[in-house]
């Protein structure tokens, strides 16, 4: 039997215009009384203001996820204007109209064609209208209604994360918060219990628990130890329908990690350690490493090491390696195998970060014994002192013993030692040492005034092992002996006025002494015995290492005696007494009435070497003569250099002089024999012959020729002078030129005869020599034309 479902109008809408009513009900004949009751109820609501009712509907309800084979019936639309004759047509529009929802245009029945999901769309809004089939006009105004999708429990709870990660400190109290999980249900929370979620724990008990309503996970077991187990995996279930049977559920995984707390003290894996080190290990040398283990991690596993007890706590130290958390035993002081061979230490390891709530577990530290054995090493000799200071008088003779040094082998073998002086510190070999007993003695004489301190180095070397040696500085002080006489501090030269009075101070004397007596210097001054009697001056000793020169008479005559030389004896008071004689020069000068010097023997003051005026004049005269001689010699040499190269026009050598160029002349080729000029032979006729140069040279840059008029005048002047010179050589000489021959555009040059020997010579061939000899051809061609005329 097909069942029809009628949806009743929830409330009537009263309007001044005709209203709609919806007599929707189940299409089952079993509920006529209920429908009449609803219609009556609707009629009674509008007794006071009765108006025409057109539609009797407002909203419909439809269950989601319908699985039937037929269309799902939604409801029926009906208008009061519908008389059942088929004259009205129902039209549906809005959300899903024609697709999800269809309407029977004759009866107004609405059906859903597809399965609907409330989670996708919970409400559909549609519009209904009834029109006249014949006229096509609406008989009622268009009205809007909704279709609500009723929820069913078709969605399981879903957690916000697939996997949760959380941490909680180990040893935490029961009920300590760990993490909160959250699940959501897409069903309608306002309709039944479809969206009411309850949490429960499926895996992770008895360590953790979860609150059913909030999803908060807490610790459920006391004293969970990270060192025993660090990771926990908890599975939480979320179930809807309030956890009742038939509800849907979802699960999630929570990975919980226990974080470390300092609940474990450090522990040494062994109680005793033993190391060895040579006695030569310098301070800071690592000997060995010890390590205590701590089950904690991070800063809770940090360990500090310290030496708390033992006979070697002042000889060794322990430092902590922050990376490896190891204790490094190091040498603190120099070791000596001969003094102590074994040391015992007590080393403690402790945690710097301690949590007071775990002190009940015991002290967070541990200790171990460290035994250190010192190995013997062959050591160099050791001097009895770090440095030696000796003294010796400067008048000590050679081979005088100054003192001694001592060194011995610190090893048990006590190897013998020999001594030597480092000659780099005693280059002059002033001192020497006995290699057997270390006695220091002199090998040269000493002088305190030359060098007060001598700093040398003594070397002690083991005889059996020369590689083992030690050095010690030796400072030798040379003690003073009075072996130097006092002398004037400076050269004294003073003056006295001609009108000086007796007992007048003219100069104060000072003395110095290279010696350095223990009681200080004490000098005495006096005139030399040979000058003490009849002296014109006296010496006054001031008893403070100074003395004054006083005049002994009234007035002095510089014309009679212009200079006085006073020998002064200076003595010291040391033993043996040393003395010296110094000379003070006193000049007699003319002074004004104030005692200021006006004139003395100026030549003596200016020329202290004693040269007279005559000697100076002679020296100046010699210098003048020497300068004149040099000037004359230079002038003669210059005049010789200016002798002409072309002596006369008749010179049959006929040298060609090239200006503004170098090379190619007789001065360069040395063709001219100067010996023939000095010893001329009788002249004889010589035939002229042309020479072809043997060597070829690269062409040179042709210099700019002088003006033709200047060259012609110069040659003419030289020719006239040579023609009148009786000493001109009447012969030709062979001239070899550096630039001529096959490399030249012109042919070879022959000697040009002078006008006195070959006056009738034809120079026309010069025109055939080319453009380079055009100037020469013009010159000699002009001469021929002058002869003809």
UniProtKB/Swiss-Prot annotation:
> Which residues carry the post-translational modification Phosphoserine, per the record?
785, 789
Query: What Pfam family is a match for this entry?
Result: Cadherin
**Topological domain ranges for the Extracellular compartment:** 54-615
| Highest taxon, organism lineage | Eukaryota
Q: Which UniProt keywords apply?
A: Calcium, Cell adhesion, Cell membrane, Cleavage on pair of basic residues, Glycoprotein, Membrane, Metal-binding, Phosphoprotein, Repeat, Signal, Transmembrane, Transmembrane helix
Report the gene name. Cdh6
Q: Does the keyword Ribosomal protein apply?
A: no
Membrane topology per the entry is: Single-pass type I membrane protein
Q: Where is the Cadherin domain?
A: 54-159, 160-268, 269-383, 384-486, 487-608
What are the start and end residues of every segment in region (Disordered)?
259-288
The transmembrane residues are 616-636
Please list the tissues where expression of this protein has been recorded. Highly expressed in kidney and brain.
Cite the ranges annotated as topological domain Cytoplasmic. Answer: 637-789
Recall the GO molecular function terms of this protein's record.
Answer: beta-catenin binding; cadherin binding; calcium ion binding
GO terms, biological process: adherens junction organization; calcium-dependent cell-cell adhesion via plasma membrane cell adhesion molecules; cell migration; cell morphogenesis; cell-cell adhesion mediated by cadherin; cell-cell junction assembly; female gonad development; homophilic cell adhesion via plasma membrane adhesion molecules
What residues does the annotated propeptide cover? Answer: 19-53
Sugar attachment sites: 255, 399, 437, 455, 536
Q: Where is the signal peptide?
A: 1-18
Return the GO cellular component terms, semicolon-separated.
Answer: adherens junction; catenin complex; glutamatergic synapse; plasma membrane; synapse
What protein name does the entry list? Cadherin-6
**What is the source species?**
Rattus norvegicus
Q: Where in the cell is it found?
A: Cell membrane
Q: InterPro entries under this entry?
A: Cadherin, Cadherin-like_dom, Cadherin-like_sf, Cadherin_CS, Cadherin_Y-type_LIR, Catenin-bd_sf
Q: What is known of its domains?
A: Three calcium ions are usually bound at the interface of each cadherin domain and rigidify the connections, imparting a strong curvature to the full-length ectodomain.
Q: Does the keyword Repeat apply?
A: yes
């Amino acid at each position: 039997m097909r069942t029809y479902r009628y949806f009743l109008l929830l409330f009537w809408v009263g309007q001044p215009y005709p209203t709609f009513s919806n007599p929707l009900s189940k299409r089952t004949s079993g509920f006529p009384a209920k429908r009449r009751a609803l219609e009556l109820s609707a009629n009674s609501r509008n007794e006071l203001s009765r108006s025409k009712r057109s539609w009797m509907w407002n909203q419909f309800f439809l269950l989601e996820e319908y699985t039937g084979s037929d269309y799902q019936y939604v409801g029926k639309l009906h208008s009061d204007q519908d008389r059942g004759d088929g004259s009205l047509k129902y039209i549906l529009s809005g959300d899903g109209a024609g697709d999800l929802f269809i309407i029977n245009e004759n009866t107004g029945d609405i059906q859903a064609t597809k399965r609907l999901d409330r989670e996708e769309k919970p409400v559909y809004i549609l519009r209904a209208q009834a029109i006249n089939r014949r006229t096509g006009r609406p008989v009622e105004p268009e009205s809007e209604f909704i279709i609500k999708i009723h929820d069913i429990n078709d969605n399981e709870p879903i957690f916000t994360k697939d996997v949760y990660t959380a941490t909680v400190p180990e040893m935490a109290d029961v009920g300590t918060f760990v993490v909160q999980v959250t699940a959501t249900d897409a069903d309608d929370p306002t309709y039944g219990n479809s969206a009411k979620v309850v949490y429960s724990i499926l895996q992770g008990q008895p360590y953790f628990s979860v609150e059913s309503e909030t999803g908060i996970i807490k610790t459920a077991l006391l004293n969970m130890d990270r060192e025993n187990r660090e990771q926990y995996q908890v599975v939480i279930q979320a179930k809807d329908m309030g956890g009742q049977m038939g509800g849907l559920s979802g699960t999630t995984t929570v990975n919980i990690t226990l974080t470390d707390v300092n609940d474990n003290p450090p522990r040494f894996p062994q109680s005793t350690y033993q190391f060895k080190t040579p006695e030569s290990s310098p301070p800071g040398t690592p000997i060995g490493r010890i390590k205590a283990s701590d089950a904690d991690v991070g800063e809770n596993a940090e360990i500090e090491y310290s030496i708390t007890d033992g006979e070697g706590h002042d000889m060794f130290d322990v430092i902590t390696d922050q990376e490896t958390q190891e204790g490094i035993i190091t040498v603190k002081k120099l070791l000596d195998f001969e003094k102590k061979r074994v040391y015992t230490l007590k080393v403690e390891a402790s945690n710097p970060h301690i949590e007071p709530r775990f002190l009940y577990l015991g002290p967070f530290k541990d200790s171990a014994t460290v035994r250190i054995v010192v190995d013997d090493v062959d050591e160099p000799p050791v001097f009895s002192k770090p440095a030696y200071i000796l003294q010796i008088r400067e008048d000590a003779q050679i081979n005088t013993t100054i003192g001694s040094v001592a060194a011995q082998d610190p090893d048990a073998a006590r190897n013998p030692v020999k001594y030597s002086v480092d000659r780099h510190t005693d280059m002059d070999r002033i001192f020497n040492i006995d290699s057997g007993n270390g006695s220091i003695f002199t090998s040269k004489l000493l002088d305190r005034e030359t060098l007060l301190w001598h700093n040398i180095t003594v070397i002690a070397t083991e005889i059996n092992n020369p590689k083992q040696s030690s050095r010690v500085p030796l400072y030798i002080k040379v003690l003073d002996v009075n072996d130097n006489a006092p002398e004037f501090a400076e050269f004294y030269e003073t003056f006295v006025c001609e009108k000086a009075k007796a007992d007048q101070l003219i100069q104060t004397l000072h003395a110095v002494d290279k010696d350095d007596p223990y009681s200080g210097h004490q000098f005495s001054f006096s005139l030399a015995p040979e000058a003490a009697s009849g002296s014109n001056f006296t010496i006054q000793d001031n008893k403070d290492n100074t003395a004054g020169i006083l005049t002994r008479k009234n007035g002095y005559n510089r014309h009679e005696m212009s200079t006085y030389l006073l020998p002064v004896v200076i003595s010291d008071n040391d033993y043996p007494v040393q003395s010296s004689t110094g000379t003070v020069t006193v000049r007699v000068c003319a002074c004004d009435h104030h005692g200021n010097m006006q004139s003395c023997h100026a030549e003596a003051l200016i020329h202290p070497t004693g040269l007279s005026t005559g000697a100076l004049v002679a020296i100046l005269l010699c210098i003048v003569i020497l300068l004149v001689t040099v000037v004359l010699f230079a002038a003669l040499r210059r005049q010789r250099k200016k002798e002409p190269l072309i002596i006369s026009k008749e010179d049959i050598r006929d040298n060609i002089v090239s200006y503004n160029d170098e090379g190619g002349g007789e001065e360069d080729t040395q063709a001219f024999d100067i010996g023939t000029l000095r010893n001329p032979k009788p002249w004889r006729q010589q035939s002229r012959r042309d020479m072809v140069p043997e060597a070829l040279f690269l062409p040179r840059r042709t210099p700019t020729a002088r003006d033709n008029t200047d060259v012609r005048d110069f040659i003419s002047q030289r020719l006239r002078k040579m023609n009148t010179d009786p000493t001109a050589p009447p012969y030709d000489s062979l001239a070899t030129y550096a630039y001529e021959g096959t490399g030249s555009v012109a042919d070879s040059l022959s000697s040009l005869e002078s006008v006195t020997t070959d006056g009738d010579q034809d120079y026309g061939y010069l025109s055939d020599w080319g453009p380079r000899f055009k100037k020469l051809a013009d010159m000699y061609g002009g001469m021929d034309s002058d002869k003809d005329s």
